[in-house]
Regions:
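Aliphatic-rich helix starts adjacent to a transmembrane/signal segment
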Residues: 3-59, 197
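Short, glycine/small-hydrophobic-rich surface segments
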Residues: 34-35, 40-44, 57-84
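Short, ordered beta-strand-loop transition motifs
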Residues: 70-75, 96-99, 157-161
């Protein structure tokens, strides 16, 4: 005994609804999985970036040319001297945001006497989709009286007053979707600039 045409149409309709439902469910699962992976990857990248910045800032010291340890201190830029490769020479390190990209510039001193030639700066990209702004700065600076709740130093920063730097990294993990900003924060005391030892 066979199926009637009406029974066949009903079965095809039910199977069609099941296929559409399963496909929609699968698409949602894959989309959420991709978002979770992107977020996890972005979080790991941010932690790695923060660890590097903190390590380099912690060992800030005067340049080989006798310059003060910190060169520039602004909301989304910092430049300083630090021996990052253990060769005894202090590299000039600069972290800055260009549009929505976090970059790092390094100048190795050359010549005799040693000089830091800005034409020799090697710039690398650290992260994309950075959303820091003047109202949510990448760097905040504090003096030796920082108690944990004090306000940061006001602009323009007097670099000789800086003893602690707070780093706030705002990343948009997926710029193609509505902004879901992730904030990663760390702070560092500048060991070689302490005067309360």
């Amino acid at each position: 005994r066979g199926m009637t045409l009406i029974e066949l149409v009903i079965v095809i309709g039910i199977l069609g609804i099941i296929v559409v439902t399963v496909a929609s469910f699968q698409t949602n699962i894959l989309s959420n999985n991709r978002y979770s992976f992107d977020s996890l990857s972005s979080a790991q990248d941010a932690r790695t970036i923060l660890r590097t910045i903190v390590k380099e800032l912690r060992s800030t010291s005067p340049g080989n040319n006798g310059s003060y340890a910190i060169i520039t201190a602004a909301t989304n830029t910092i430049a300083f001297y630090s021996d990052t490769n253990g060769d005894g020479l202090k590299e000039q390190i600069r972290y800055f945001i260009a549009t929505t990209t976090l970059k790092k510039g390094v100048i190795i001193p050359t010549g005799s006497p040693l000089v830091y030639n800005s034409n020799n700066e090697n710039i690398t990209v650290l992260a994309y989709n950075i959303r820091n702004s003047t109202s949510s700065p990448l760097f905040e600076y504090y003096d030796e009286n920082y108690s944990g709740t004090s306000s940061p130093l006001t602009l323009p920063i007097t670099i000789t007053k800086v003893h602690l730097i707070k780093i706030n990294l705002l990343i948009d993990a997926n710029p193609n979707k509505a902004p879901v900003l992730r904030t990663y924060t760390s702070q560092v005391s500048l060991r070689n600039l302490k005067d309360n030892l």
